[in-house]
Design a protein with these regions (language model features):
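N-terminal hydrophobic/helix-forming segments and targeting peptides
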Residues: 1-407
Length: 407
């Protein structure tokens, strides 16, 4: 008789689910689309922010989107708004990469065409060389109403481009560290054109063919490069995950799994907030610095108050609810690197596979304080989940994330 380890099977299923989610989400638009699809599959209704929110009763679950890349989902709790706080998980849909510029085609010697790009976020440039790349994002199309153009998503799944390294024969110092020019060195090759063809609108024509539209109906686009290499497991026991965009799609997936894991009506209202543009400061209408999440949550309280026929001031109820809320800002943390241990704090360095991490920063780049850390650690203890702490090496500047912006 073969013994089956249920815990190992569950972990394996979650890992496979994450790999599928990563591969289906090459850029922020597809990450949001994948998230929306999973929510609808599990009974969440779609709301339109331009329409009146329905009266909400306990157990109702909905989601609303912002600009195609931010998704906010919630499940209404049993208690009246002022009697319980929101329980939120926040993460972000964007990752560092390259955005295609307008008028992107550049004709080179030998009729080779490359595309003009600009770096998005804090990319490690050298990791983009000599990889099979493609395009994904959204395309905006003309309609009869100038104020309401049509949006189409485009995900080219086959390798289409490559950013080619310079051969070592022309760059003998390549392994000694080379300063890269974002404008010169990081432009992907698209192909070789025939003598009879022109580079004029070459990319638009390719987009038009793929979408089945006329080139002149393409008004604009938000297109990005992505690495077509599928996400996979590595390691002797497949204990590691190798993929781009783990920051922060792994936490988007974890937040989704947490929301879907329990479909019972909760005591307090649960919410999952996935923002965009964290990698560039969160200052957009779909970013964490925008008022959209607060507006959605306030409208949620108003709608629930109407359904319960409450006589209290719903706006005051909203503020009271905020004061009782708890938010987890879910982002990636740096585990101990076996080749660069000196970069880590000597006493607060997490290791892979030893539980979630509480990140602390004296400059307040994270939301964590002693009170929040105590609550999270107690939740972990009661759930039987080990946890770790992370603090930056004092000589190494760390990054920031959503938490301190939202709180």
């Amino acid at each position: 008789m073969q013994e089956i380890n249920i815990i190992d099977m569950k972990q394996e299923n979650i890992a496979e689910s994450l790999l599928s989610f990563m591969s289906a989400s090459p850029v922020n638009f597809m990450a949001a689309q994948t998230l929306e699809s999973e929510l609808e599959k599990h009974g969440f209704g779609r709301l339109d922010a331009t329409e009146q929110m329905p009266r909400l009763k306990a157990g109702d679950q909905y989601f609303v989107t912002k600009n195609g890349t931010a998704v906010f989902a919630f499940r209404v709790g049993r208690k009246a708004p002022a009697e319980s706080g929101f329980k939120l998980i926040c993460a972000h849909s964007d990752s560092p990469g390259f955005r295609i510029k307008p008028n992107a085609e550049m004709l080179c010697e030998g009729k080779v065409v490359k595309l003009n790009t600009e770096v998005y976020g804090g990319a490690i440039l050298s990791t983009w060389f000599d990889r099979p790349l493609s395009l994904a994002g959204r395309v905006i199309l003309r309609t009869d109403n100038p104020m309401q153009p049509e949006t189409r998503l485009m995900h080219v799944k086959r390798a289409l481009l490559q950013i080619s390294n310079l051969a070592i024969h022309f760059n003998r110092q390549v392994n000694d560290g080379v300063k890269l020019s974002k404008q010169k060195d990081m432009l992907p090759v698209l192909g070789i054109i025939d003598q009879t063809l022109s580079t004029d609108n070459l990319l638009l024509k390719e987009i038009a063919v793929r979408l089945g539209v006329a080139p002149e109906d393409i008004l604009d686009f938000d297109l990005y490069l992505y690495d077509t290499t599928p996400a996979c497991t590595v390691g002797l026991n497949q204990e590691f995950i190798s993929a781009g965009r783990l920051d922060d799609l792994s936490m988007v997936h974890a937040g989704l799994e947490a929301l879907l894991a329990n479909d019972l009506t909760p005591e307090a209202t649960q919410a999952l907030a996935i923002f965009d543009n964290e990698e560039t400061g969160s200052g957009t209408k779909q970013g964490a610095a925008s008022p959209f999440l607060a507006q959605v949550l306030e409208r949620l309280v108003l709608a629930q108050s109407k359904a319960l026929n409450l006589t209290t001031d719903p706006r005051d109820d909203f503020y009271r609810m905020i004061e009782q809320s708890f938010m987890v800002s879910a982002d990636n943390a740096h585990a101990w690197h076996p080749n660069y241990g000196e970069k880590m704090d000597p006493t607060n360095h997490p290791v892979l596979g030893s539980g979630p991490i509480i990140k602390v920063n004296a400059a307040q780049k994270y939301a964590t304080d002693a009170d929040g850390a105590a609550v999270f650690s107690e939740v972990c203890r009661k759930a039987g989940v080990p946890y770790q702490r992370f603090v930056n090496h004092s000589d190494v500047a760390g990054g920031s994330t959503l938490g301190n912006i939202l709180t």
